[in-house]
């Protein structure tokens, strides 16, 4: 895949970046180099390589999530000027 000058201008427009005519050719070259590198990465044979999330082994095991209500509702609304059933009460501000 190759990026032309029109594509560079379109990308700049979509990104809301002001690009002068003098800046288009260098940007075009940079984008083409990036795409060439990505194509190189796509050509690498990774069959047999196990997917990983980190290059270093995990020292800590992940724990299962436990969903709770937190148990802090009373402490949270304790200092509120007005509260009811563990909810903050605020004056009506919109008619």
Curated annotation (Swiss-Prot):
UniProt keyword annotations, A-Z: ATP-binding, Ligase, Nucleotide-binding, Protein biosynthesis
Reaction equation(s) it catalyzes: L-glutamyl-tRNA(Gln) + L-glutamine + ATP + H2O = L-glutaminyl-tRNA(Gln) + L-glutamate + ADP + phosphate + H(+); L-aspartyl-tRNA(Asn) + L-glutamine + ATP + H2O = L-asparaginyl-tRNA(Asn) + L-glutamate + ADP + phosphate + 2 H(+)
Molecular function, one GO term: glutaminyl-tRNA synthase (glutamine-hydrolyzing) activity
One BP annotation, GO: regulation of translational fidelity
Enzyme class: ligase
Domain of life according to the entry: Bacteria
SUPFAM superfamilies, per database record: Glu-tRNAGln amidotransferase C subunit
Record-listed E.C. numbers: 6.3.5.-
Family named by the database record: Belongs to the GatC family.
Function in brief: Allows the formation of correctly charged Asn-tRNA(Asn) or Gln-tRNA(Gln) through the transamidation of misacylated Asp-tRNA(Asn) or Glu-tRNA(Gln) in organisms which lack either or both of asparaginyl-tRNA or glutaminyl-tRNA synthetases. The reaction takes place in the presence of glutamine and ATP through an activated phospho-Asp-tRNA(Asn) or phospho-Glu-tRNA(Gln).
Subunit structure: Heterotrimer of A, B and C subunits.
Protein name: Aspartyl/glutamyl-tRNA(Asn/Gln) amidotransferase subunit C
């Amino acid at each position: 895949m190759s990026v032309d000058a029109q594509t560079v201008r379109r990308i700049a427009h979509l990104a809301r970046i002001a690009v002068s005519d003098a800046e288009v050719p260098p940007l075009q070259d940079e984008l083409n180099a990036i795409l060439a590198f990505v194509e190189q990465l796509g050509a690498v044979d990774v069959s047999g390589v196990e997917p990983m999330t980190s290059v270093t082994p995990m020292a800590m095991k992940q724990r299962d999530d436990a969903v709770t209500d937190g148990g802090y509702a009373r402490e949270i609304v304790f200092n509120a000027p007005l509260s009811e059933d563990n909810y903050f009460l605020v004056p009506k501000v919109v008619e």
